[in-house]
C-alpha cells in the first residue's frame, strides 16, 4: 500500500473501509502471524473527538480478553501520525454476511450464536463497557463457528468520562434500545440486551423486528410498537426462544432479563432441553453457569453454523463432496478396467 508504513507489518488487501477509517489484512514480519489493522483516515486523525473515540476503543479492547471478543494486539501512530491498532484477523465473515447469503438461520444456530454473544457481552459489562452498537455486522465469525464481538468505536466506558454529549443519539437505528433513542444519560448494559433481541429476531426470521422506512418511523416503532412474534415467521422456533426474544425487546430496561449471563443460561437450557448441546463442565441446573465459552459446549448448533460458514465461503463441505465424487469416479474406472481385462481374456 502506498503512503504511510507500519513498522514490522506487511500490509495486504483492504478488508473494509468506512467514513473514518480502513481495515487491512497484514502479516507480522517477525512471526508470520496474519492480523487485521484498523487505521484512521488522515483527514480525521486530527479531529479531537474522533481521535479520542479511537483511543478509547483501543483502551477498551486492551481490557477485554475473551474468546468471543476480537483480540487486541496493540496500537499507536503510523509514520504519518495516523492512529491505528492491530487486532485478530477473523476470516469467516460476519453474521450479517450469513443472513444476506441464506436469509433466516436455523433456530439451533441462533441459540448457539446467542449463547456466544451473551458470553462476550457479560465480559464487557463486567468491565464497565456498554457496546451501544451491537448488530449482525459487528458479530464476526471464525471458520470453525466461533462468534467474535467487534467494533467498540462508540462503546461507553462507565468508568471514564463520556465522549457523547448528553441527549445525543448514538448507535445503529434498527438495533437501538428506546433509552438510546431518547438519549437517556443512565443507559446501561440493558441497551445491549435489547440490541441482542433485535439480532436474534433477525437471525431467526431473516428480517428486522421493525421495518420503518424513515428514521422517525423506526424510532416510533422502537418506542411504542410490538413486532410480530418470531415464531409467527420462523417455523419450528421453540416457544422458550420466542419468549427470550420477547423479554429482550421489552421497552423498559427493568423489564428485560437481569443480565447477559441470565440470557446465556436460558440459551443453554433451551439447547439441553432439545438435546442440541451438552455442557462439558456444569449443567445449567446447578445454577453455576458463569461464563461458558464455545470450547466448553458440544453443540449441534455450532456445527451447523460452521457448515453455513463453509458453504458461504465455498470451502469445507464442498471440498469434501468433490473428493468423495473423485473417489467414486476412480473406483468406477478401476472396476471398468478390470471388466475390460476379463473380457479380453
What are these regions (language model features)?
Residues 119-129:
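Protein kinase catalytic-loop region centered on the HRD/HxD motif
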Residues 22:
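Conserved N-lobe ATP-binding subsite of Hanks-type protein kinase domains
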Residues 41-63:
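AlphaC helix of the eukaryotic protein kinase fold
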Residues 172-278:
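C-terminal lobe helix-coil module of Hanks-type protein kinase domains
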Residues 74-76:
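A short, aromatic-enriched beta-strand patch in the conserved N-lobe beta-sheet
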Residues 113-114:
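Activation segment signature within eukaryotic-like protein kinase domains
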Residues 80-94, 98:
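Conserved short submotifs of the Hanks-type protein kinase catalytic core
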Amino acid at each position: 500500500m502506498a503512503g504511510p508504513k507500519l513498522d514490522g507489518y506487511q500490509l495486504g488487501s483492504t478488508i473494509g473501509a468506512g467514513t473514518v477509517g480502513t481495515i487491512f489484512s497484514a502479516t507480522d514480519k517477525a512471526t508470520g502471524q496474519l492480523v487485521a489493522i484498523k487505521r484512521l483516515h488522515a483527514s480525521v486523525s486530527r479531529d479531537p473527538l474522533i481521535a479520542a473515540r479511537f483511543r478509547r476503543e483501543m483502551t477498551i479492547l486492551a481490557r477485554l480478553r475473551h474468546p468471543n471478543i476480537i483480540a487486541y494486539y496493540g496500537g499507536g501512530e503510523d509514520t504519518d501520525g495516523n492512529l491505528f491498532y492491530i487486532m485478530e484477523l477473523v476470516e469467516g465473515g460476519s453474521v450479517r454476511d450469513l443472513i444476506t447469503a441464506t436469509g433466516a438461520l436455523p433456530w439451533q444456530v441462533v441459540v448457539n450464536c446467542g449463547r456466544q454473544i451473551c458470553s462476550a457481552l457479560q465480559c464487557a459489562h463486567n468491565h464497565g463497557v456498554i457496546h451501544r452498537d451491537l448488530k449482525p455486522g459487528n458479530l464476526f465469525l471464525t471458520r470453525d463457528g466461533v462468534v467474535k464481538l467487534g467494533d467498540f468505536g462508540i462503546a461507553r466506558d462507565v468508568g471514564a468520562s463520556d465522549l457523547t454529549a448528553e441527549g445525543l443519539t448514538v448507535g445503529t437505528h434498527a438495533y437501538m434500545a428506546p433509552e438510546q433513542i431518547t438519549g437517556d444519560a443512565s443507559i446501561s448494559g440493558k441497551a445491549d440486551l435489547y440490541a441482542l433481541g433485535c439480532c436474534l429476531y433477525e437471525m431467526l426470521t431473516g428480517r428486522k423486528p421493525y421495518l420503518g422506512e424513515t428514521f422517525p418511523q423506526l424510532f416510533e416503532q422502537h418506542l411504542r410498537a410490538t413486532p410480530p412474534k418470531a415464531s409467527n415467521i420462523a417455523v419450528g422456533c421453540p416457544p422458550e426462544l420466542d419468549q427470550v426474544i420477547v423479554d429482550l425487546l421489552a421497552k423498559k430496561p427493568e423489564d428485560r432479563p437481569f443480565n447477559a449471563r441470565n440470557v446465556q443460561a436460558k440459551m443453554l437450557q433451551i439447547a439441553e432441553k432439545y438435546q442440541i448441546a451438552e455442557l462439558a463442565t456444569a449443567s445449567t441446573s446447578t445454577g453455576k453457569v458463569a461464563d461458558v465459552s464455545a470450547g466448553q459446549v458440544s453443540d449441534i448448533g455450532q456445527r451447523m453454523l460452521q457448515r453455513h460458514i463453509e458453504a458461504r465461503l465455498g470451502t469445507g463441505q464442498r471440498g469434501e463432496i468433490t473428493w468423495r465424487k473423485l473417489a467414486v469416479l476412480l473406483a468406477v474406472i478401476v472396476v471398468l478396467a478390470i471388466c475390460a481385462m476379463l473380457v479380453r481374456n
